[in-house]
UniProtKB/Swiss-Prot annotation:
Broad enzyme group: oxidoreductase
Function: Cytochromes P450 are a group of heme-thiolate monooxygenases. In liver microsomes, this enzyme is involved in an NADPH-dependent electron transport pathway. It oxidizes a variety of structurally unrelated compounds, including steroids, fatty acids, and xenobiotics.
Induction of synthesis: P450 can be induced to high levels in liver and other tissues by various foreign compounds, including drugs, pesticides, and carcinogens.
Species, as recorded: Sus scrofa (Pig)
Lineage start: Eukaryota, Metazoa, Chordata, Craniata, Vertebrata
Transmembrane segment boundaries: none
Membrane topology classification: Peripheral membrane protein
Chain sites annotated for binding heme: 442
PANTHER family: CYTOCHROME P450 3A5, CYTOCHROME P450 FAMILY 3
Record gene name: CYP3A29
Keyword field contains Transmembrane: no
Family: Belongs to the cytochrome P450 family.
UniProt-listed Pfam families: p450 (PF00067)
Protein name: Cytochrome P450 3A29
Length: 503
């Protein structure tokens, strides 16, 4: 039997040509860094280097840093990524050349209405939305929002007390995830939910749908392999964000907005109201104000950016305190000195707590929620003697920077003293980037820090964390999406002095 099909010569030529073209399509960009003399791992056709992410982006970047030094080139599919760790280059990318060259993040496929979200908007649209939203996150506005967040701090204590009374180990993500969800949905959408005790609430269910993400999701991989599919998906109204959830939040915001416009008693100082106010400001050019679609997109991106980051950071913080009882005790002493007899925390006093700030900063050094920062290069440019072609994505590997032994002695150790007043001024600001830096840094940085600090103070006023047999020591991480524990952080919760305040 003939094993080779009896195709005509023309068919064989067509088949061979197709295979060659397919190969060239999947590899044509892969010679870029070799031409530029920039080292890096060898890419595979279509995949590039993404298979190296299977153990986590942090593991991959650390390996590249050890092997290639301060700069290397990799490929996500066919997309070239230039990783830089030199502080001067980082400053050029994130600050100096932000408006002219490195304005935008990498475009990730069909976004639908979410292209209007601050984190995803580009160029002039991003500038306009950022300008409109910036007043929402001033210290004055956050101070006005503080009572809302404080209410959920009390609810957090109440929920923890119930768990502590059971005498069983507690999964930190469940508790802090509920707190984070409650704060975000309350401030961004004006709804009050106790998500730990109401997991079926549609706000909770739709928020969690938004947060399901995997780098190896087939849909996402198809966009990496074949980016030309993006406009086709846009036309078909297929996006990276679940349509049902976006529709739910659109209807909810419309209903909430109408309610607040007709009944002034329902108004309060929160992110939603501040965005509505910006829409209706007489001083605002109506062509520059937020549209209803943009208002919804900001609310959704606040959930996307705020829920996972805060809950993961607090879980990791609790782990470090449980495994460093001396740090936990010292922090509790500062809390007691600042708020005697378990007095309710205040915005101004929280901001002045030096050791609390040190503990939070060191946690975000060890566990930066975003393992990388990315900026797309809009035009050919040379930065500090390195030519960066248009279309290249420049990556700042934050996880690697935060654990570089040349910058941080014994970087794997948890040492809040690194951020004491004595040492803080010696830290190069372009080597510590938990919230990014420059014009496109995290707009919600102050909000996130206030949120975390309030939760930590309220919990430590009433409880102490201790490891238990279910606690994974040492902790292992996964960074295929955001930095989080490979296994949930499970700890024992011990009430202090047998009493719980504010619960």
């Amino acid at each position: 039997m003939d094993l080779i099909p009896g195709f005509s010569t023309e068919t064989w030529v067509l088949l061979a040509t197709s295979l060659v073209l397919l190969y060239l399509y999947g590899t044509y960009s892969h010679g870029l860094f070799k031409k530029l003399g920039i080292p890096g791992p060898r890419p595979l056709p279509y995949f590039g280097n993404i298979l190296g992410y299977r153990k986590g982006v942090d593991h991959f970047d650390k390996k590249c840093f050890q092997q290639y030094g301060k700069m290397w080139g990799v490929y996500d599919g066919r997309q070239p990524l230039l990783a830089v760790t030199d502080p001067n280059m980082i400053k050029s990318v994130l600050v100096k050349e932000c408006y002219s060259v490195f304005t935008n993040r990498r475009s990730f496929g069909p976004l639908g209405a979410m292209r209007n979200a601050l984190s995803l908007a580009e160029d002039e649209e991003w500038k306009r939305i950022r300008t409109l939203l910036s007043p929402t996150f001033t210290s004055g506005k956050l101070k006005e929002m503080f009572p809302i967040i404080s209410h959920y701090g009390d609810l957090l204590v109440s929920n923890l007390r119930k768990e502590a009374e059971k005498g069983k180990p507690v999964t930190m993500k469940d508790i802090f995830g509920a707190y984070s969800m409650d704060v975000i949905t309350s401030t961004a959408f004006g709804v009050n939910i106790d998500s730990l005790n109401n997991p079926q609430d549609p706000f909770v269910e739709n928020s969690k749908k938004l947060l399901k993400f995997s780098f190896f999701d087939p849909f996402l991989l198809s966009l990496i392999f074949f980016p030309f599919l993006t406009p086709i998906f846009e036309v078909l109204n297929i996006t990276l964000f679940p349509k049902s959830s976006v529709n739910f939040f659109t209807k909810s915001v419309k209903r909430m907005k109408e309610s607040r416009l007709t009944d002034q008693q329902k108004r309060r100082v929160d992110l939603l109201q501040l965005m509505i106010n910006s829409q209706n400001s007489k001083e605002m050019d109506p062509h520059k104000s937020l549209s209803n679609e943009e208002l919804v997109a900001q609310g959704i991106i606040f959930i996307f950016a705020g829920y996972e980051t805060t809950s993961s950071a607090l879980s990791l913080l609790a782990y470090e305190l449980a495994t460093h009882p001396d740090v936990q005790q010292k922090l509790q002493e500062e809390i007691e000195a600042t708020f005697p007899n378990k007095a309710p925390p205040t915005y101004d006093a929280l901001a002045q707590m030096e050791y609390l700030d040190m503990v939070v900063n060191e946690t975000l050094r060890l566990y930066p929620i975003a393992a990388r920062l990315e900026r797309a290069c809009k035009k050919d440019v040379e930065i500090h003697g390195v030519f960066v072609p248009k279309g290249t994505v420049v990556v700042v590997p934050v996880f690697v920077l935060h654990r570089d032994p040349d910058l941080w002695p014994e970087p794997e150790e948890f040492r809040p003293e690194r951020f004491s007043k004595k040492h803080k001024d010696t830290i190069n600001p372009y080597t510590y980037l938990p919230f990014g830096t420059g014009p496109r840094n995290c707009i919600g940085m102050r909000f996130a820090l206030m949120n975390m600090k309030l939760a930590l103070v309220r919990v430590l006023q009433n409880f102490s964390f201790k490891p238990c047999k279910e606690t994974q020591i040492p902790l292992k991480l996964t960074t295929q999406g955001l930095t989080q524990p490979e296994k949930p952080v499970v700890l024992k919760i011990l009430p202090r002095d047998g009493t719980v305040s504010g619960a």
